[in-house]
Amino acid sequence: MAVKIKLKRLGKIRSPHYRIVVADSRTRRDGRAIEEIGLYHPVQNPSRIEVNSERAQYWLSVGAQPTEPVLAILKLTGDWQAHKGLPAPAPLLQPEPKADKRALFEALSSDGDEAKGEAITPKAKKSDKKADEAAEASASTESTEA
């Protein structure tokens, strides 16, 4: 039985998520898998890649052939180099930790407690043009009546 390590697509339209699976080469893309050894989320920045290195090494050692996309992922994680005995690549980029929303809220709310002065510029008053036009219109109606 020929075994392949391939990607199994999950997710919605235009929002792909993949699982890295070991499956018989004759099964369809999203068909039954022998084992799931990782996941790949390409939409996130940087892409989320998680591979169970121990299981990937096992399946590579017993002859499982990775597909081209999985081979690229295994090279990024360093599992392919470990299998072939090559030097390891640079570590993967990790996403920045998200800021604590509660601490951010408290910091902003403490800044808002300070009394702030009134507006520097006064409110704009209605323009004198509109008042002049209204006066001219009423004057012209009075002159035509006389």
From Swiss-Prot:
GO molecular function: structural constituent of ribosome
A Pfam short name: Ribosomal_S16
The keyword Ribosomal protein belongs to this UniProt entry's keyword annotation: yes
Annotated keywords: Ribonucleoprotein, Ribosomal protein
Region: Disordered, residue numbers: 84-146
InterPro entries linked: Ribosomal_bS16 (IPR000307), Ribosomal_bS16_CS (IPR020592), Ribosomal_bS16_dom_sf (IPR023803)
GO biological process, any: translation
Keyword Ribosomal protein tagged: yes
SUPFAM superfamilies: Ribosomal protein S16 (SSF54565)
Listed HAMAP family: Ribosomal_bS16
Name by which UniProt lists this protein: Small ribosomal subunit protein bS16
Organism from which the protein derives: Streptomyces griseus subsp. griseus (strain JCM 4626 / CBS 651.72 / NBRC 13350 / KCC S-0626 / ISP 5235)
Designated gene of the protein: rpsP
